[in-house]
C-alpha cells in the first residue's frame, strides 16, 4: 500500500498532506530532526533523526518503496526516491520526474557554485496561495498514479 513520506522540517503543506492522506486512508510519516506537533491520528507518525545535513533525507531514502510518495523540495533526495521508483512532489505542486531531475540537479549544482564564488543568486519565490492549491490538486493526481504503480 502506498505511503507518504514528508521531509518535514520546513514543509509548508503538511496539513494538506494529512487531509489528502486521510481521504484515501494512506499512512503518512513525517521525518525531521526535531519533534513537530502533529494531529492525533494512528495513520500519522513522526520519525526524529539526529541533527545532520542529510539525516532526514537518508532515513526517507532508506524507508521509501516503489509507489510511495515523497513530499520534498530537496533535489538530491528527490533523485534518490525516483531511483527507488517512488513518486516525488514539491510543496509548490510541481512533481520531480525522471525527465526533470537531471536538469534540476545541474541547476542546483550551478547555483551552489555561483554562491560559493560570491555571486548573489537570490532564493526561491515566496510560497503563495496558488502553490497550496496546485499542491492539493497535484497530490490527489499523484495518489492515483501511485495506485497504478502498486495496486
Curated annotation (Swiss-Prot):
Q: Which family does it belong to?
A: Belongs to the UPF0178 family.
Protein name listed in UniProt: UPF0178 protein amb2838
By its UniProt entry, which NCBIfam families does this protein fall under?
PRK00124.1
Q: Which PANTHER family match?
A: UPF0178 PROTEIN YAII
Q: Name one Pfam family in it.
A: DUF188
**Domain of life of the organism in this record?**
Bacteria
**Organism per entry:** Paramagnetospirillum magneticum (strain ATCC 700264 / AMB-1) (Magnetospirillum magneticum)
Amino acid at each position: 500500500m502506498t505511503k507518504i513520506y514528508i521531509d518535514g522540517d520546513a514543509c509548508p503543506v503538511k496539513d494538506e498532506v494529512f487531509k489528502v492522506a486521510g481521504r484515501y486512508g494512506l499512512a503518512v510519516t513525517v521525518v525531521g530532526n526535531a519533534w513537530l506537533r502533529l494531529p492525533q491520528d494512528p495513520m500519522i507518525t513522526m520519525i526524529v533523526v539526529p541533527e545532520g545535513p542529510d539525516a532526514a533525507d537518508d532515513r526517507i531514502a532508506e524507508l521509501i518503496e516503489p509507489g510511495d510518495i515523497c513530499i520534498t523540495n530537496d533535489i538530491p533526495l528527490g533523485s534518490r526516491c525516483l531511483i527507488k521508483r517512488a513518486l516525488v512532489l514539491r510543496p509548490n505542486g510541481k512533481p520531480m520526474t525522471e525527465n526533470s531531475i537531471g536538469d534540476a540537479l545541474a541547476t542546483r549544482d550551478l547555483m551552489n557554485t555561483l554562491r560559493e564564488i560570491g555571486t548573489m543568486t537570490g532564493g526561491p519565490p515566496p510560497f503563495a496561495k496558488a502553490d497550496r492549491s496546485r499542491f492539493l490538486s497535484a497530490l490527489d493526481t499523484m495518489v492515483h498514479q501511485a495506485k497504478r504503480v502498486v495496486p
